[in-house]
Amino acid sequence: MSDSNSRLVYSTETGRIDEPKAAPVRPKGDGVVRIQRQTSGRKGKGVCLITGVDLDDAELTKLAAELKKKCGCGGAVKDGVIEIQGDKRDLLKSLLEAKGMKVKLAGG
């Protein structure tokens, strides 16, 4: 009687019965890493957003840490996007191209 629509309603086992949650899957990019400068919603402070990097979360965090050290500034990883504080697009482009990534400067 195992049906994909049936689930356990009552059990004498202790504890809460939770279904395991699937890890969110990010869509694959087109192979181009884009660097965009953004100031909106940041009280006039500019940040560079790096999108399109096809790495898992642990490797993305390592890459962000390395870029922050080389740029000498702060940053964060949010929802698969690396944020680097300040307008360092040219330096970021050269660093990512040295790693063998195809990079485009997007936006204004």
Swiss-Prot record:
GO terms for molecular function: ribosomal small subunit binding; translation initiation factor activity. Pfam families: SUI1. Keywords: Protein biosynthesis, Translation regulation. Residues 1-31 are annotated as: Disordered. The keyword Ribosomal protein does not apply. PROSITE patterns: SUI1 (PS50296). InterPro entries: DENR/SUI1_TIF (IPR050318), SUI1 (IPR001950), SUI1_arc_bac (IPR005872), SUI1_dom_sf (IPR036877). Residues 15-31 have a biased composition (Basic and acidic residues). It comes from the Bacteria. The keyword Protein biosynthesis applies. Transmembrane segments: none annotated. Belongs to the SUI1 family. This is Uncharacterized protein YciH. It comes from Escherichia coli (strain K12).
